[in-house]
């Protein structure tokens, strides 16, 4: 990554707006079917239940997009204030799942454990 502008452009196009694609929900469901015990493996069945209950695919994608924005914004804000000692953020993404307070690293049932 290069400049600040390149970073925020990447985050917007490749993280936030990825949920606007028509196949976004199908990709999540398919991944969860292949690997149901993986972190957030329970999100695919949740999407299927919402669709079966009549939720609009477009509305669900908008909710996912807004959630992604809030997550990116909150992360960038936290990195800036309060920050990380010695700006030690390299490879921080590898530690994210270990911070799940349920101890399940985001796997199915982790939301229920809170």
Across the structure, where does each feature detected by a protein language model lie?
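Polybasic, proline/glycine-rich intrinsically disordered low-complexity segments
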Residues: 1-29, 86-114
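Amphipathic protein-protein interaction modules
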Residues: 46-103
């Amino acid at each position: 990554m290069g400049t600040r502008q390149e970073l925020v452009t990447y985050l917007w196009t490749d993280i936030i707006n990825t949920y606007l694609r028509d196949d976004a929900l199908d990709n999540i469901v398919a991944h969860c079917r292949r690997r149901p015990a993986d972190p957030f493996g329970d999100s695919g069945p949740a999407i299927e239940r919402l669709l079966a209950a009549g939720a609009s695919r477009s509305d669900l994608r908008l909710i996912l997009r807004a959630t992604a924005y809030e997550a990116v914004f909150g992360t960038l804000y936290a990195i800036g204030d309060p920050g990380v000692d010695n700006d030690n953020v390299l490879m921080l993404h590898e530690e994210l799942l270990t911070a799940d307070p349920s101890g399940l690293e985001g796997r199915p049932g982790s939301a229920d454990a809170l």
